[in-house]
A protein has these predicted regions:
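Short active-site oxyanion
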Residues: 1, 39-41, 136
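Residue-level detector of anion-binding/catalytic polar loops
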Residues: 1-2, 26, 64, 108
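NAD(P)-binding Rossmann-fold cofactor-contacting core
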Residues: 2-17
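Structural motif
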Residues: 6-8, 44-47
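Structural/interface elements that position substrates and couple domains in central-metabolism enzymes
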Residues: 9-12, 27, 76-78
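Cofactor-cradling patches in redox/metallo enzymes
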Residues: 25-28, 44-45, 54
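Short acidic low-complexity segments
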Residues: 26-38
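Phosphate-binding loop of NTP-binding sites
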Residues: 34-37, 46-176
Length: 176
């Protein structure tokens, strides 16, 4: 696994990047230098602009490009029990609480969260915004801000609340 991040280039979140490096993740500046083989797959969030050198390099050499949401949805949708948490606010708290309840109940859920989950923090996982389980249960935030919520097919859907945060009411009705 290799990667780049504008926060790395800006000197932010050094402890997170040091943690990744210590586990063998090769980090590159976000200048395209890490995208060198057509066999590579570039995974980026929808917040990464087409003008970012990594995206341009991937296009130039013919490397596959996908979004974080598409990759996450593929993993999420393949779980036997998928629980998607949506809404304008409270998603991270709900995912963290549900993940912890399932964990304490003896389940081994995979969890993808938008924030660190304090109950799961330990020396091997000091940030704990994600947890790899046994694949049976997958609990994740699903985001409506960029429309990627439509990629997810949860077996259980939790909608905390809906307000005019990222989309118009008509767009929200279509997504939900």
């Amino acid at each position: 696994v290799e990667g780049s991040d504008r926060a790395l280039d800006q000197g932010r979140n050094a402890e997170r990047f040091d943690f990744l490096r210590a586990r063998g993740v090769l980090l590159h500046p976000q200048d395209g230098s890490g995208v060198i083989r057509p066999s590579q797959i570039l995974v980026s969030s929808t917040a990464v602009e087409d003008t970012v050198p990594d995206v341009q390099a991937a296009r130039r050499i013919g490397a596959a490009i996908t979004t974080r949401a598409k990759l996450l949805a593929e993993l999420f949708n393949s779980a036997n029990v998928s629980v998607g948490v949506a809404g304008t606010s409270g998603k991270s708290t709900t995912v963290g609480m549900l993940g912890w309840i399932l964990h304490r109940a003896g389940k081994n859920p995979t969890i993808m969260n938008g924030a660190d989950m304090k109950n799961f923090v330990d020396p091997d996982s000091p940030f704990a915004s994600a947890r790899i389980g046994d694949g049976e249960i997958f609990v994740s935030e699903v985001d409506e801000s960029d429309g990627s919520i439509a990629l997810f097919t949860p077996r259980v859907a939790i909608v905390n609340n809906i307000s005019l945060d990222h989309k118009s009411m008509d767009e929200l009705r279509t997504l939900f």
